[in-house]
């Protein structure tokens, strides 16, 4: 064992402050990056909701599978310190790679605002995420245990407080990052064109990871560094493998039965190890239903974020971005953990109710299930406000009269008459095979003009008319609400020459006469824009201001010549803004956070209390593995489900967890609590009597009651 001399501050080893700061920065880096992923996949890489959700949960699953690799490296090869440093370097490189992958100008050679080679961005993103998963997962089982190693015997009180501080550092980093990085994302940046600033939003977490690494290395001279003492997970696996093999070798009736299947390892392994593995397998058996909880919990960053994009983020004077709603969980965690520990549990105990660890975990599962019932109710309310878009064999048409006369448009079975500068109230829906003819007429002009156009099924179209014989059909290109709560704006030019419009850093270039531009998308708020044209006198006003944009709307701005010869702009609503407020997500976040506090914190404490001293790392890896399996469950459901309504998927998850909750309650009913310390003390006593007096070579890992490891 190699160690440095321990220096103290307020009764704590000075080294632990470097570890706490490192953990704060690392969690800021991880959660700041993770908060952006789903919207980055959908809006930058152009993936649909299901693929975005699937890749997101694949990444999270990898982050919770790699701790097994990290524990193996630390235990059998590098030790905790070198493992943390080495994998933190990998982690930092991964964060830098994904930041570079989000630079639009990397492949935007024609400077049109869109990447010319999306596969390059996808490849870089996947490489970055793979490196991050290896780095963050690999250091997970090492950092908290390394912090525990810094304390001397007799410092149990300080060690327990350290883990509380460590837990708050994790949630503090998570909270700040999920507030800050979405703000950075909505900024506009770019060399040749302006887009959502993903490079900055990913770059700040990358910088924080570099800071985390530097801070950790600066404390190197103060750390106690234990040499690797052998791979206990390997010993456990070999013992279990030998027991199974030996049992099948001796399965005939000629061999007497043994009390436990692990007793078949006695020919090769000592009773202490076998007894310790029995304790671990009892807890591991209880882990079997747990992934279902994580399958629901980790959807905060995917489905719930996507749900928030269809809601209104104005809460009083505050304006919240969809990916910032995840901060509600971190805020509630910081508030509720001390309240539950100091108030709720003591009150329950005073009432005489034996609220055991497994009962707490059962309640946590139930609360998470109810959170998804609430999410389903909110989704039903959202669905009521969403516009209806055309089906596969339908088209939708809106008529916009941009002329100076009244116009009548005749559809099969229906006619609409529009005054000058007006549009139909809604999009009209037609089956494509029944849309046989469309005719335009005007009371001031003789004759009827037939609209000759092949409407594209499954899409919305705008029919621009300005006199009975002149019209233009424009395919809108919007078949859903604008993504990430932004607002779509397009311009219609009624002048006799081309115009160019600049709005908040984006350019609508060369919009031809009596034609419409494509939509461009902007966050909420008022937007300044300038119309460049030579069609009006230099003294005329060319700078204008939009209305106060809300969330998820779309508008058409018609540019026309006013009576004084200058320009005027009229606004028409294409898609109404979101009306269901994001505040309605708070109850589901509250229920899920309550479930997290009583499930996750209790689960780790229970696992460690029931584990032998030298196998706490084994159970820590097993606990993290349940998170990985939970994300794999989401992958399977998202890939195979394809529910027509999102609320139905929420109800499915709630029902599955409720069933699992009942199963877990039954399993918990038959579980017998043990005291591993007493069992190990008995082995020590027996060995002393036999004159063996072996010292257990494996140091214990202290439990860390935290949910965001």
Swiss-Prot record:
User: Region (Extracellular domain (ECD)): which ranges?
Assistant: 383-585
Q: Which UniProt keywords apply?
A: Cell membrane, Glycoprotein, Membrane, Peptide transport, Protein transport, Symport, Transmembrane, Transmembrane helix, Transport
The answer to whether keyword Glycoprotein applies is: yes
What family, per the record? Belongs to the major facilitator superfamily. Proton-dependent oligopeptide transporter (POT/PTR) (TC 2.A.17) family.
Quote the subunit structure annotation. Answer: Interacts (via extracellular domain region) with trypsin.
In the record's own words, the domains note is: The extracellular domain (ECD) region specifically binds trypsin.
Q: What is this protein called?
A: Solute carrier family 15 member 1
Origin organism lineage = Eukaryota, Metazoa, Chordata, Craniata, Vertebrata
């Amino acid at each position: 064992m190699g160690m440095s001399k321990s220096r103290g501050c307020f009764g704590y080893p000075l080294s632990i402050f470097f570890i706490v700061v490192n953990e704060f920065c690392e969690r800021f880096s991880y959660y700041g990056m993770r908060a952006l992923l789903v919207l980055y996949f959908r809006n930058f890489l152009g993936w649909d909701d299901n693929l975005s959700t699937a890749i997101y949960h694949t990444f999270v699953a990898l982050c919770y599978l790699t701790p097994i690799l990290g524990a193996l490296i630390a235990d059998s090869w590098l030790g905790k310190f070198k493992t943390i440093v080495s994998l933190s370097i990998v982690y930092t490189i991964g964060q830098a790679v994904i930041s570079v992958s989000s630079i639009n100008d990397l492949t935007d050679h024609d400077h049109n605002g869109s990447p010319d080679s999306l596969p390059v961005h996808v490849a870089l993103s996947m490489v970055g995420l793979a490196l991050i998963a290896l780095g963050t997962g690999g250091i997970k089982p090492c950092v908290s245990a390394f912090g525990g190693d810094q304390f001397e015997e007799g410092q149990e009180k300080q060690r327990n407080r350290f883990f509380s501080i460590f837990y708050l550092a994790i949630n503090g980093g998570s909270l700040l990052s999920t507030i800050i990085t979405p703000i950075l994302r909505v900024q506009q940046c770019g060399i040749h064109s302006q887009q959502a600033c993903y490079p900055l939003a990913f770059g700040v977490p990358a910088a924080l990871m570099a800071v985390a690494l530097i801070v950790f290395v600066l404390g190197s001279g103060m750390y106690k560094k234990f040499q690797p003492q052998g791979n206990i997970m390997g010993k456990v696996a070999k013992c279990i493998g030998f027991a199974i093999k030996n049992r099948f070798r001796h399965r005939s009736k000629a061999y007497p039965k043994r009390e436990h299947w692990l007793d078949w390892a006695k020919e090769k392994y000592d009773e202490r190890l076998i007894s310790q593995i029995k304790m671990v397998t009892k807890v591991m058996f209880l882990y079997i239903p747990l992934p279902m909880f994580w399958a629901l919990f980790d959807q905060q960053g995917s489905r719930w974020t996507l749900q928030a994009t269809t809601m209104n983020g104005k809460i009083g004077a505050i304006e919240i971005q969809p990916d910032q709603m995840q901060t509600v969980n971190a805020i509630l965690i910081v508030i509720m953990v001390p309240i539950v520990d100091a108030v709720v549990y003591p009150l329950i105990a005073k009432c005489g109710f034996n609220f055991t660890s497994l009962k707490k975990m059962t309640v946590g599962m139930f609360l998470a299930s109810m959170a998804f019932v609430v999410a389903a109710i909110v989704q039903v309310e959202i669905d009521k406000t969403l516009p209806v878009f055309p089906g596969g064999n339908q088209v939708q048409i809106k008529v916009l009269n941009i002329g100076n006369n009244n116009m009548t448009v005749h559809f099969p079975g229906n006619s609409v008459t529009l005054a000058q500068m007006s549009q139909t109230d809604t999009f009209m829906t037609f089956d494509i095979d029944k849309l046989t003819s469309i005719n335009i007429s005007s009371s001031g002009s003789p004759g009827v003009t037939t609209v000759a156009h092949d409407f594209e099924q499954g899409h919305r179209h705008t029919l621009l008319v300005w006199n009975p014989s002149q019209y233009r059909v424009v395919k809108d290109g919007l078949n859903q609400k604008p993504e990430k709560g932004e607002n779509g704006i397009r311009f219609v030019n009624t002048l006799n020459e081309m115009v160019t419009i600049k709005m908040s850093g984006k350019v609508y270039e060369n919009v031809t006469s009596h034609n419409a531009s494509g939509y461009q998308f902007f966050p909420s708020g008022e937007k300044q824009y300038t119309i460049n044209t030579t069609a009006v006198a230099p003294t005329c006003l060319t700078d204008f201001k939009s209305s106060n944009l809300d969330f998820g709307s779309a508008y058409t701005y018609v540019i026309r010549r006013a009576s004084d010869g200058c320009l005027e702009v009229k606004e028409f609503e294409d898609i109404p803004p979101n009306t269901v407020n994001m505040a309605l997500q708070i109850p589901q976040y509250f229920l899920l956070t309550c479930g997290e506090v009583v499930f996750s914190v209790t689960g780790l404490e229970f696992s460690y209390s029931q584990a032998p001293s030298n196998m706490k790392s084994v159970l820590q890896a097993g606990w993290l593995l349940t998170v990985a399996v939970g994300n794999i469950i989401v992958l399977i459901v998202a890939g195979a489900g394809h529910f027509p309504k999102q609320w139905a998927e929420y109800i499915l998850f709630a029902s599955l967890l409720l069933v699992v909750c009942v199963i877990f309650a039954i399993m918990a009913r038959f579980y017998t609590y043990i005291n591993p310390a007493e069992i190990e003390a008995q082995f020590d006593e027996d060995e002393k009597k036999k004159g063996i007096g072996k010292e257990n070579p494996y140091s214990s890992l202290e439990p860390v009651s935290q949910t965001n490891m």
